[in-house]
A protein has these predicted regions:
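Conserved phosphate-binding/catalytic region of the ribokinase-like
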Residues: 1-8, 156-160, 208-330
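Short, conserved phosphate/pyrophosphate- and ester-handling motifs at nucleotide-, phospho-/glycolipid
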Residues: 46, 199, 263
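Short beta-strand scaffold segments in enzyme catalytic cores
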Residues: 44, 92-96, 235-238
């Protein structure tokens, strides 16, 4: 009998080909194969920290699908609810390499992929409800209408069972029919979550609010227990339903190599700390730390630390002083 999961998530994993030299993708001659997928990045990060993680998806019966399954096995992620679908392919993407710290160009080849055919038929109640926590992003609901239905099914069932839910909007505007549909759908999904983790630009686009405090207020009014807003190099702002509010300064990074995956690393830090029962201030501090680690290497998940590595960094005791509580927290 399978041990109960700490965390369950779902989404699309893709093979990713990263250019080995900087420059325009059209001129790239050589690539390195890696794995990509926002939800999977979080699953990998949490598994490396010792959590029992299950990931739900569909992959094609092809070499890319085999690569995804091999990665799951290597990372210790439960794949018993990953379906190998012979009818559709596994998606892939190309990513440029930038040496100046700017965001790389990413081109996706995912239309009609196996994962886009995820639906409520993939829901397995015992598997999902056996987990303590559900992590969702806004990517999987965007890839198809049926996958979106599954996202709401997962959130509603976990909420009804009294389990905790975190949600990172992780906007992909090109996958949605309109900005209005995207905002309405993702805000409805956020209303089912305990913890909402948008970036500042994402929060502004989704809520129409400008300040971090007002964006957080929007989601708290929908019933969230807490909202953490990523501020890039400035760190992150948090506000909770029980009145805590503050800003945690960002980690200094002298050599930014690959910005993709920073938000997923941040989510790993916040979610892992909350599952350990740590205070929100500590969770945001860890989120900043792991997000900073993620951007110092090539690849979306390669910089995510093991538990031993994280413990060494946190035991240095140099980051707690970076928490700056506002008056509202006292």
């Amino acid at each position: 009998m399978q041990a109960a999961l700490d965390v369950v998530t779902y989404g699309e994993a893709m093979a990713m080909f990263v250019a080995t030299e900087p420059g325009h993708l059209a001129h790239a001659a050589q690539f390195t194969k890696r794995i990509a997928g926002a939800d999977l990045n979080v699953a990998i990060g949490l598994s490396r920290l010792g959590f029992k993680v299950g990931w739900m998806s569909r992959v094609g019966r092809d070499s890319f699908g085999g690569y995804v399954l091999d990665t799951l096995a290597r990372e210790g992620i439960d794949a018993s609810c990953v379906t190998v679908d012979p009818r559709y392919p596994t998606g892939f993407q190309l990513k440029s390499r930038n040496d100046d710290g700017s965001d790389p160009t990413v081109e996706y080849f995912r239309k009609g992929s196996a994962a886009s055919h995820l639906s409520c038929d993939d829901y397995v109640a015992d598997y999902v409800l056996g987990a303590r926590h559900l992590h969702l992003t806004g990517v999987a609901p965007a890839i198809s209408a049926t996958s979106c239905e599954l996202a709401f099914k997962l959130a509603r069932e976990m909420r009804a069972a009294g389990k905790s839910i975190s949600f990172d909007p992780n906007l992909r505007p090109t996958l949605w029919p309109s900005a209005e549909v995207m905002a309405n759908t993702l805000n409805a999904l956020a209303a089912l979550a305990d913890w909402v983790l948008p970036g500042l630009a994402e929060g502004r686009q989704l809520t129409g609010c400008e300040s971090p405090a007002d964006i957080a207020g929007f989601y708290l009014a929908q019933g969230a227990r807490g909202v953490v807003i990523k501020l890039g190099a400035e760190g992150a702002y948090y506000r909770t339903a029980d009145g805590r509010e503050g800003t945690v300064a960002g980690e200094r990074v002298d050599n930014v190599v690959d910005t993709v995956g920073a938000g997923d690393g941040f989510a790993v830090g916040v979610v892992s700390a909350l599952l350990e029962g740590r205070a929100i201030e500590q969770a945001v501090t860890r989120g900043n730390l792991i997000g900073a680690l993620a951007i110092q290497v090539i690849g979306d998940s390669e910089g995510l630390p093991t538990r031993a590595a994280l413990d060494r960094l946190e035991s240095a005791g140099q980051r707690a002083e970076r928490i700056e509580e506002t008056a509202a927290a006292h």
